A protein has these predicted regions:
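Extracellular/periplasmic carbohydrate-active domains that bind, remodel
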Residues: 1-497
Length: 497
């Protein structure tokens, strides 16, 4: 229900309803105050005759809340194809300078608009208080030339701060110390940015990744040779040189960022990466990175209050991966990821929703609901290596479908010095889930698996603790089967099926 401030004496007008836990209101007036009345309705079937052959739905109001909000002023819109920018959307012309000039000229609360067409570009840098809007048919296409992603920037990959190639879109500057200051709100390098529309943001994908790995392997050949057998601690020989790859969108020390409605695809590794950020909201987006190594979709990393909903994933790795640093550096930086919310998301291919394996700074207060990850490889997974240290706790997953639930130690990405202790995994609840016990691999083949696998760490005191499963169903829909369960090195695990 909705009414504007100038309708103060009027009744609220019903504008829509939803069976989801989100709703988008469109076509509002600029610079206008609105009141929004939200009602939660519970529907029950009531029998009309004794044998129950006829029934009627009765609606029962269970909760309501009124929200007051004020829309922004109408933005100044800069079309990148207009003079003096004159960007060309022919899929051939390199438009980096033209688009960056439009971004630099964008005033506070202004909008840079990408019209229909394919606009080739290298790395771009956004600033505070702006919007990047992609019209229907617009493609912001990153090149596959590594030179177009220079200079390198200070970033973090797989839990370690390091210099990486600039991403296609770059927001903020990395500053871990800023998150520890009493006035940390004033330390954010980039605030109040929207990236939205109906178009596509794409990078150079696998070709760009392979070119960067080849170049960096040559740069590091002496160092890699000096590692000897230690290189076996890495996932593969290319792991170390691959860590300099750019993301599709890199946010460092950012606050109040919205990504909405766009297709995000073909980053050279992770697509959306938030490092030391606060309040990043992503909704209505489609992620595609199938066939790309480390092709994660959405990765909050030592960040606060990040939310994603109403998104679809077809990825070469995790759909969502919640992180907080690796081994001693992650322990010392000591910035946990907190307050993550994931709901109404669907996976058509990829690994699903994971926490870790880089979780040395801690992960807590995560809620996941209304998600369909049936086509994922892992489903829902909490993972870490024995070297990590840190903790994962207060994780709540409900009203969703997964092939399986995993909480365990893993052996990959295990290079580097160990942290001071093994990780702690505890205080997790899983309610009203369907676990199919069947997962889909990267070649779209299906395999049986344990529906629940819990395996704590081998050091005494680091068992998985305080985990509760309730209202769990096993098997494909309309085909309930016994789910295989594996539990090792755990304490206080309860199950109610």
């Amino acid at each position: 229900f909705l009414k504007s401030a100038d309708q103060a004496e009027a009744d609220f007008t019903l504008i829509g309803s939803t069976q989801k836990t989100h709703y988008t209101i469109e076509n509002l007036q600029a610079n206008t105050e609105y009141e929004i009345l939200v009602k939660g309705i519970y529907q029950v079937d009531v029998a009309l005759i004794e044998d129950g052959s006829k029934s009627v739905q009765i609606e029962k109001e269970i909760k309501q809340q009124t929200i007051t909000m004020h829309t922004f002023n109408r933005s100044v819109v800069i079309d990148i194809t207009n003079a003096p920018y004159n960007a060309v959307g022919d899929g051939k012309t390199l438009n980096t300078k033209a688009i960056q000039s439009a971004i630099d000229d964008c005033p506070k609360d202004g909008c840079v608009m990408i019209p229909s067409g394919t606009f080739m570009t290298g790395a771009l840098r956004l600033h505070s208080d702006m919007e990047l809007y992609l019209a229907k048919g617009a493609v912001l296409q990153g090149t596959s030339n590594p030179e177009d992603y220079l200079p390198r920037i200070w970033s973090r990959f797989e839990g370690t701060e390091m210099e990486c190639y600039s991403s296609l879109l770059n927001l903020g500057v990395l500053d871990p110390e800023g998150m520890h200051r009493a006035d940390y709100d004033s330390t954010f390098a980039c605030k109040n940015v929207a990236i939205r529309g109906k178009g596509t943001i794409a990078s150079g994908g696998r070709v760009l990744a392979e070119r960067i790995i080849a170049s960096e392997t040559e740069n590091l050949k002496d160092y890699l040779a000096s590692l000897g057998d230690k290189i076996k601690e890495c996932e593969k020989p290319e792991t170390i040189p691959a860590r300099v790859r750019p993301r599709l969108i890199n946010m460092s020390n950012c606050k109040n960022v919205e990504l909405a409605g766009v297709t995000l695809r073909d980053g050279a590794c992770w697509n959306i990466h938030m490092i030391y950020c606060d309040h990043v909201v992503t909704h209505g987006c489609t992620f595609y990175s199938h066939g790309i190594w480390n092709g994660d979709g959405w990765d909050p990393d030592s960040s606060l209050d990040c939310v994603i909903f109403d998104c679809v994933f077809n990825t070469g790795d995790d759909s969502v991966s919640i992180k907080s640093g690796k081994n001693p550096q992650g322990n010392e930086v000591n910035i946990p990821t907190k307050g993550v919310r994931v709901f109404d998301c669907r996976c058509t291919m990829g690994h699903g929703i994971t926490i870790g394996s880089e979780m040395s700074g801690g992960v807590e207060d995560v809620k996941i609901w209304d998600c369909d990850m049936e086509a994922a490889l892992c489903g829902f997974e909490i993972k870490g290596t024995a070297k990590r240290g840190g903790y994962v706790k207060e994780i709540h997953v409900y009203d969703s479908v997964f092939p399986r639930v995993l909480m365990h130690s893993v052996g990959y990405n295990d290079d580097g010095i160990a942290g001071p202790d093994q990780p702690y995994f505890s205080d997790c609840t899983f309610d009203n889930l369907r676990l199919t016990g069947i997962y889909q691999d990267h070649e779209a083949k299906w395999h049986e698996c344990d529906a629940i696998e819990l395996c704590g760490f081998d050091k005494i005191g680091h068992e998985i603790r305080h985990v509760k499963f309730s209202n769990i169903r096993f098997g494909k829909e309309k085909l309930d089967t016994a789910g295989h369960i594996s539990i090792k090195r755990c304490e206080d695990v309860s199950m109610n099926f």
